[in-house]
A protein has these predicted regions:
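Sec/Tat signal peptide C-region and signal peptidase I cleavage site
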Residues: 16-20
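Sec-dependent N-terminal signal peptides
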Residues: 4-14
């Protein structure tokens, strides 16, 4: 019994840390930037994603309703809290350490760069 308890304590002490969450920050260029901050929960199956939207320094309440993230592409759709209006659509491709692409907000497309945070 003591050997089993000792062995379990040893295994617990050498277990690697669980990297259960990650994040990305996407930002447009210009004087009135749009910034999207994503928290990505790594789970079995599809990841859980939550997002925060800042438009020219003003926080916009949003919900992430659709997303796609893999080694080569990031896609995201953010809507208002009642899910009646699309607030932002993002589509970006892997470019070295970044994801570069387009954000569409209020009918206007803008270039965006996303970084892991």
């Amino acid at each position: 019994m003591k050997k089993t308890a000792y062995f379990l304590a040893l295994l617990t002490g050498i277990a690697p840390p669980a990297n259960a969450t990650g994040g990305m920050t996407c930002r447009t260029a210009g004087s009135r930037p749009i910034q999207v901050s994503l928290v990505i929960g790594h789970t079995t199956g599809s990841p859980l994603v939550s997002g925060r939207l800042m438009d020219a320094g003003r926080a916009i309440e949003v919900r992430a309703v659709q997303w796609w993230l893999d080694a080569s592409e990031l896609r995201l759709l953010l809507v208002d809290p009642q899910a009646t209006r699309a607030e932002l659509a993002l589509k970006a491709k892997k470019n070295g350490r970044f994801y570069d692409g387009t954000i569409v907000r209020s009918g206007r497309a803008r270039w965006v760069r996303c970084r892991e945070s």
